A protein has these predicted regions:
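Alpha-helical transmembrane segments and their immediate juxtamembrane cytosolic regions
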Residues: 1-395, 401-406, 410-417
Length: 417
């Protein structure tokens, strides 16, 4: 089976950065428990939330980035993927250590022992060596530190998946669906320590990641008719309204009465661990509507108001890690200084401002680093430097995979996380 990959004129899809930044902000706000900030996150208005969007976009962008690297051979592409896996893993371990240090220091310093148990940091006190070892193995995870281990696993398994997807995309997508169904049916999951299993079941959540990759490489072009269908539009909007009402019903008994106990219990509690089908469908509906009403060349994407979100999306690994720490610090400050509405809003605004500042700093730092690789004679970049990878459209004919090397000098290279 021969396939060819054709690229449109070079253009960075700012929608990916925008929504990835939005997912980061939403996850930060949703991780400050017991505050009005959680009502600014997605999870209270539908079945899916920022984590679903984050994993989907990560799969989409990973396919775009590493398809080009696979052009130079499977071994080279795999080595680049594993290098990125190592970067994500080390970021998680650094976050893991700093997070535990913050929790235990503030707990001791301000005589707040409940912090240790609330954020699942207590086991480190009783068995530090064992828990640190299990942390390195990604089996022990304090509260809110579940996303990056999931991403390490998904990226670590991506080389053979991408290689196969470039040749048999539909077969890989079908295999992903079958694995998802089997994991839910037979309760397959990875073990956690000291007990239980992973909060984000990789065997189920891989479906979102693979769906993103499949759409990036072939599915988006073939399913474009969904964006033009008025019937799909009506059904999508109806499902979003249903999802919002059903989710709000978990907090409002008056709404719960509209659905009845049997229907309500089908959707509550929301099965996030095993990626309930209604969560997956909810995100797909959001993606269809987003692609329909926000085209890739929408002029509004260049507006100044969206630049902080886009910048946070472009530097999402660093922003995500900082956001997790800020969520804990924000919660602690509110417990210490008062949990009034104004204080909560100030904590949320300060957290987003710091995350945005980190994103701009990292973007500036990367530009400085890249400029150091410029040739001192003619100002050209070193040969190993790569440009951006834009949206791919799968077509018949040709060989696997020849990807154009066009770049847009106005935008930074597309990154996978």
């Amino acid at each position: 089976m021969k396939l060819g990959l054709a690229l449109p004129p070079p253009q960075r899809d700012l929608r990916l950065d925008l929504f990835r930044g939005l997912a980061n902000w939403a996850m930060f706000l949703g991780h400050v428990p017991g505050t009005v900030l959680v009502w600014c996150s997605f999870r209270n208005y539908g079945f899916s939330d920022g984590a679903d969007l984050f994993v989907f976009i990560s799969g989409y962008t990973s396919a775009l980035v590493y398809t080009r690297k696979m052009e130079r051979g499977f071994v080279f592409g795999t080595s680049r993927l594993f290098r990125r896996v190592w970067q994500i893993y080390t970021a998680h371990i650094l976050l893991f250590l700093i997070y535990l240090a913050f929790v235990h220091f503030l707990s001791e310093r301000f005589n707040a022992p409940d912090l240790v148990n609330l954020f699942n940091a207590g086991p480190v006190t009783s068995a530090p060596v064992e828990m640190m070892t299990q942390g390195l193995l990604l089996r022990y995870k304090p509260l809110n530190l579940d996303v990056l281990p999931l991403y390490v696993v998904l990226m670590g398994l991506f080389p053979p998946i991408l290689w196969l997807m470039l040749r048999f995309p539909d077969a890989v997508m079908i295999g992903s669906v079958l694995l998802y169904l089997a994991a839910r049916q037979f309760h397959w999951n990875l073990p956690s320590y000291p007990s239980g299993s992973w909060y984000f079941n990789p065997l189920a959540w891989q479906l979102l990641f693979v769906t993103g990759a499949w759409l990036a490489l072939t599915g988006a072009g073939r399913l474009h008719f969904l964006l033009r269908s008025r019937f799909v539009l009506v059904v999508a909007i109806a499902y979003l309204i249903f999802g919002a009402l059903m989710t709000l019903a978990a907090h409002q008994p008056q709404l719960r009465a509209l659905f009845g106990p049997a229907l309500f219990e089908l959707f509550n509690p929301n099965d996030k661990t095993n990626l309930a089908p209604y969560r997956y469908l909810h995100l797909m509906v959001l993606i269809i509507l987003g692609a329909r009403f926000i085209p890739i060349d929408a002029r509004g994407l260049q507006a100044t108001i969206w630049r902080p979100l886009i910048k946070c999306g472009q530097q999402s690994l660093e922003v995500f890690c900082v956001g997790i720490l800020l969520a804990f610090i924000g919660y602690f400050i509110l417990q210490l200084a008062g949990n009034g509405i104004l204080a909560q809003l100030l904590v949320g605004a300060a957290g987003i401002a710091i995350m945005t500042a980190v994103a701009y700093y990292r973007a500036w730092s990367k530009r400085v680093e890249k400029s150091s690789h410029e040739s001192p004679v003619d100002g050209k970049r070193a040969p190993e430097s790569t440009g951006s990878v834009e949206h791919l459209v799968l077509r018949g004919g040709g060989r696997v995979p020849q990807v154009a090397r066009g770049t847009d000098s106005r935008q930074p290279p597309l990154t996978e996380v």
